[in-house]
């Protein structure tokens, strides 16, 4: 497998966006491009096993580190920070356009996980893609997102780019409380070794700024509004862990699925054992196979 790193300007005008491209060494029978839009706190480098699996089957895998994640560090803040939600959407488009220019005749598939799933759901034009996979997404109240964003904007005036333990607890604390007696981050990964890898990864960013929460809430609010008229003009597959609190333990993601299904019959859903990050948990091989089978159809 060939792994290429590219730096291109982010649409926020400050960040050097880190793009990773994984390609088979033999390119005589390429099947398509798979773009990954990763989750919160993580980065594209965590998808090496995914890339190995799919490059061995003739796909090129690529994706960018979202603003303030991984190697896409922003000079505006040392923690998770986004100045404008739309910049994350535009960066995803920029990454696709960069790679598609090199492989103009290959179909493009889109995978969004968690934070990445909301970026995908707020993308205006999905026509360049043949299919999409949304993992660990949910249905949040647009009204609640507006209320919380207004409160945080007032409380943290002048400190929007600074790390906040309260914001971190607001975003992640409630998930852990649903698994009393379990280790920290069990809501994310059920496997002990996988959790250790995650916790020990120096590129995982846990510090969260109020600005990040506010912009993320805008994305969730937009995704919630879009359920009235989903932008799912392409086939969509939803995947989730049965114990995933982000997906509402199946209730939230199924609400999104039903809205998509009404708009496009070519929509499917499947659940797996596990919590939130099923792509990196002990059941990851069955997830990979499910995705590979879906892309082949």
Predicted regions and their residues:
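N-terminal cap/lid segment of alpha/beta-hydrolase-fold proteins
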Residues: 1-26
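Alpha/beta-hydrolase active-site loop
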Residues: 81-100
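Alpha/beta-hydrolase-fold enzymes
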Residues: 120-203
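Short beta-strand/loop motif that positions the catalytic acidic residue
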Residues: 238-240
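Conserved alpha/beta-hydrolase "acid-adjacent" motif
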Residues: 245-255
